[in-house]
Amino acid sequence: MKCALIGERLGHSYSKLIHEAFGLYSYELVSLPKDKVGAFMENKEFDAFNVTIPYKRTVMPYCSYISPEAQKIGSVNTVVRTSDGLHGFNTDYFGFKSMAERAGIDFAGKKVVILGSGGTSLTARAVASDGGAERITVVSRSGEYNYDNLEKLADCEVLINTTPVGMYPNNGSSAASLDKFPRCEAVLDVIYNPLRTQLIMQALERGIKCSGGLYMLVAQAAQSAKYFCSAEIGKEEIERVFRSLALDVQNIVLVGMPGCGKTTVAEELSKLAGRKAVDTDSLVEESAGMSVPEIFSQYGEKRFRELEAQAVRGAAKEKGLIIATGGGAVLDPGNVRALKGNGRIYYLKRDLDLLSLDDRPLSKSRETLDKMFEARDPIYSNCADAAINNDLSPVLTAQRIKDELGSSDI
């Protein structure tokens, strides 16, 4: 069986990885300009296909049958070729509902605010309505409720983002701040790249129930497989594929004192895990055309930190990397937020007597090193998801990190 995904821009899609992880059929990504959609619908090369932005409504007139849920939502994201024409379905409903259930988010009796008024907003509205929401309000750029009068919705209890704001490569932006919603107790964001958007990061910092969109993507793909080939993919298999993909795309971030071995451990971990390792100090040196000590000497620490922030935030946007940071990178809260968006942070601990002080502009003596550790240790500890002792060999430390990642929560 030959299946595909059609859309306008699919360069960063995870759909091929997800569908082929189920092992039921081949799956291709087909980027199409709008004027080619009609020809694709009539071409019988693919037995079934998914549809993403901006064609979920475009394909509907070509379908001889549209399922009740697709009619209710007003969009089709799954099409199957049959003997009597194209049949259209919507599996986003199942995916969104599954994401909310996994996060323990219940809509019954809740005041729900949905950011965005596009096709995915319709899906969120349908799920929240069927779940018994007390009130559902849609926020758009020019509607009665817009981003300039969010204070009118301060009683929001469940916030849902269906806009692309905060999606790669524009990580770090958010359609709204949770500061506007003091009574908010749950957040859902359909964006899956990065794993944790700025909005989800705000929810995590407040201890609010939340979920990014990757689980929705996997769950809706599983439901699509049901229509493609009558496959019944259960929750355990959905969880397996979700977890495997999340671990693969998540960055491994190493933080800690200057000279604690982050770069060396990253290189060993790269060999063990088959991932690319990058060092943010090296990225700074490449962009500046001079060494870190030279940057400090000629331009001072402030300029170095500016270059470092660019390097850290650029690397943090990517997926599946091992990122060895400079000792002071996490002093900037913006860097920490960027790294956490798509990564798991490990605090690499090492006895101060074992630290290398070569070419370390800010830790040239034991006295300055002790003061630095006293100031930075709480910062490293607070930003890290796990702490790993690096007093043994770099190979053993790398193996510890690999093992911890495999057993970590997503």
Q: How should each PLM-predicted stretch be described?
A:
Residues E239-L245, E268, L272, R344, ...:
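NTP-dependent small-molecule kinase module
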Residues Y145-C210, A329-N335:
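Rossmann-like adenosine-cofactor binding region
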Residues K2-A103, P194-R196, I200-Q202, R206-K209, ...:
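Phosphate/diphosphate ligand-binding glycine-rich loop within oxidoreductases
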Residues G341-I379, A386:
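A glycine- and Lys/Arg-enriched "phosphate-lid" helix/loop adjacent to the NTP-binding pocket
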Residues G7, N90-Y93, A100, G109-S129, ...:
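Glycine-rich adenosine-cofactor-binding loop
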Residues D279-K340:
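ATP-dependent small-molecule kinase phosphotransfer cores
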Residues K262:
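Conserved lysine of the Walker
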Residues I191-Q250, N390:
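Adenosine-phosphate binding glycine-rich loop
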